[in-house]
Amino acid sequence: MQLFCETSDIGSRPSVATIGFFDGVHRGHRYLIEQVCAVAAERGLASSVVTFPVHPRKVMQADYHPKLLTTCDEKVSLLAKTGVDYCMMLDFTPEIARLSAREFMFILKERYQIQALVVGYDHRFGHNRSEGFEDYVHYGRELGMEVLLARAYAYSKEASVTEVTVSSSAIRGLLQEGNVSEAAEYLGYDFFLDGTVVGGYQVGRKIGFPTANLRVSDSDKLIPCDGVYAVRVCVEGKEYGGMLSIGYRPTLENGPDRSIEVHIFRFDADIYQQPMRLSFVRRTRPELKFDSIEELIAQLHRDEVEIKSILSL
């Protein structure tokens, strides 16, 4: 996949494209992109995704501070795995926000050589999102751009005949509840946090459960709700099982800051300042306050047994 930014020389060939923010690049997004690639193959054109580095609503609403499933770099990496030919990263500015749908489509056609546009079944664009699919088709005829409506993605949970709508907002809600396993079903992969290992209070080592503390690389990244999780840890190019705690360590009273700290099984290397990825498998319990350190240690041993079983370790 080739990535073109706002200031890039757009050397792409004519393409079939779709537009969206694509936070999380979940199953629904990938189904839409599959349709783009299929139409492109039928017409002998390239396939493109048009997206934005910053959430459009953040530009239009100064007090909106979204917590996102993926950073911009993570999103690009996931898009590259879809097989799409081009990713066109447009800066969503107030000027772009004021464009009508027709004006925006004109830019896509003339600057980015987009010959056909596949519109998500529930997607709207243009100033105030006031126009709909029939309007896009009409403008497309005027501009010489084919406009197609994508099929909706229908996802059925295991052992259920009920279809659910997969959306980034629904996945965010699941993660904020700690339901990381169901979020993974919608995403099609385990939700993850990337960051750097930083220094902590060293209490974990004193009680027999040394931890690596993660500083997340992007402040806009969503962090699941407080609690204990079974996770997979990728560090120094290898994967390990881990027992993760997110929260404020109420038993230890180490200060007001929220911590993300993981005890990595069968691991004892110094990884301070190293990059690390945590992939969430299951939340096992909420954060609890214990009456003594001894009670905390006993619970950590029970957590270890349960999480090793979940991870088949």
Regions flagged by a language model, labelled:
Residues 2-8, 67, 88:
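Short acidic-hydrophobic, aromatic-tinged amphipathic segments that line or gate anion-handling sites
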Residues 26, 79, 117, 183, ...:
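Residue-level signal for inorganic ion chemistry
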Residues 141-247:
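Glycine-rich, Lys/Arg-enriched anion-binding loops that position phosphate/diphosphate groups
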Residues 200-313:
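Phosphate/ribose-recognition catalytic cores of enzymes acting on nucleotide-derived substrates
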